From Swiss-Prot:
Entry similarity comment: Belongs to the bacterial ribosomal protein bL17 family.
Any single Gene Ontology cellular-component annotation: cytosolic large ribosomal subunit
Oligomeric form and interacting partners: Part of the 50S ribosomal subunit. Contacts protein L32.
GO biological process entries: translation
Organism the protein comes from: Syntrophomonas wolfei subsp. wolfei (strain DSM 2245B / Goettingen)
A GO MF label: structural constituent of ribosome
Protein's UniProt name: Large ribosomal subunit protein bL17
Keyword match Ribosomal protein: yes
Pfam families on file: Ribosomal_L17
UniProt KW keywords: Ribonucleoprotein, Ribosomal protein
Amino acid sequence: MSYRRLGLRSDHRRSVLRNSVTSLLKEEKISTTETRAKEIKRLTEKMITLGKRGDLHARRQAAAYIMSDEVVQKLFSDIAARYEERNGGYTRLVKTGYRKGDGAPMVMIELVE
């Protein structure tokens, strides 16, 4: 399987990941479980690569996935310019401990400066 199931139905998984990628690009740092963060990282790297391409088709592909027009604008203007010289590795995972309720490993996923 080329993706993580995350214990969710396919439509719910897609929605959770789209929201998380949008939040990460907007806030530049979010806290989530380790498994979700690894999947968010994979998708965010793809979105930033689209932003670096910068053509109309890439913008439309990103807009189809990202849930906010303001975030798409930020991706193509600010974030893509920041990573112009970097080939991949745009995000970092920092382990922050375990969630109190169920002991799930938590991480902070953030954009590399």
